[in-house]
A protein has these predicted regions:
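Bacterial N-terminal signal peptides that target proteins for export
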Residues: 1-10
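N-terminal signal peptide c-region/cleavage motif recognized by signal peptidases
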Residues: 13-21
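Conserved beta-strand hairpin/beta-sheet module of binuclear metal-dependent hydrolase folds
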Residues: 24-73, 171-180
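Extracytoplasmic
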Residues: 26, 41, 76, 83, ...
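A mature extracytoplasmic/lumenal domain signature
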Residues: 33-35, 57-60, 82-87, 110-112, ...
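Active-site environment of divalent metal-dependent phosphoester hydrolases
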Residues: 38-40, 61-63, 86-91, 113-116, ...
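Active-site HxH/HxHxD metal-binding segment of metal-dependent hydrolases
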Residues: 73-151
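Ligand/cofactor pocket segment of small-molecule handling proteins
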Residues: 141-180
Length: 180
């Protein structure tokens, strides 16, 4: 016969297993425009069952528009756009993305926000004429990420590099699927 303690332990273990099994495994969908872009930066759509987080927004409007199509095709609700670097090839596409997904939060660590604020005018003055129609209509500065992680459907995405020698260049580690 099972004691009350054993029954409680088994029930707790069963609930923990069921909760773990219920959490959808996160999936990654990488977009890289390749030679079609001045800077072939990779953007990554991290998707759960219903929601998604985008890491990096592309450089040109054309590449950002392709990214919008990819996100829409996923049928996921974009909750967050995370910007990992302060260089324009990671954030100039924000204008296009936020127009398509106005409810998505745009976040970056403080050092990235500081880097963008310090360089955006010069970067736009230099790259704008070279970009032509791909130039953003306006540049957006992300809100400051609080802490060192993002959450997608209860799963942590850890922001790494904030305590390193170049905190304005971070990356995202996803422990549940052991992916960067």
């Amino acid at each position: 016969m099972f004691s009350t303690f054993k029954r409680l332990t088994l029930a707790t273990a069963a609930l923990a297993f069921a909760a773990h099994a219920a959490a959808a495994e996160l999936k990654l969908d990488v977009y890289n425009p390749g030679e079609a872009a001045i800077f072939p930066v990779s953007s990554v759509l991290v998707s759960g069952e219903k929601d998604a987080i985008l890491v990096d927004a592309q450089f040109g409007k054309g590449q950002a528009e392709q990214l919008v199509q990819k996100i829409r095709a996923s049928s996921k609700r974009l909750t967050t756009i995370y910007i990992s670097h302060g260089d324009p090839d990671y954030y100039f596409g924000l204008d296009t993305l936020t127009a398509a997904f106005p409810d998505a939060k745009v976040l970056a660590p403080q050092p990235v926000v500081d880097h963008i604020n310090a360089t955006v005018a010069d970067k736009l003055a230099f790259w704008g004429p070279k970009m032509g129609a791909d130039k953003p209509a306006k540049t957006l500065v992300p809100q400051v990420l609080k802490g060192h992680s993002l959450t997608l459907e209860g799963q942590q995405l850890e922001v790494v590099g904030l305590d390193g020698p170049q905190p304005d260049r971070s990356f995202v580690w996803i422990p549940s699927i052991k992916a960067v």
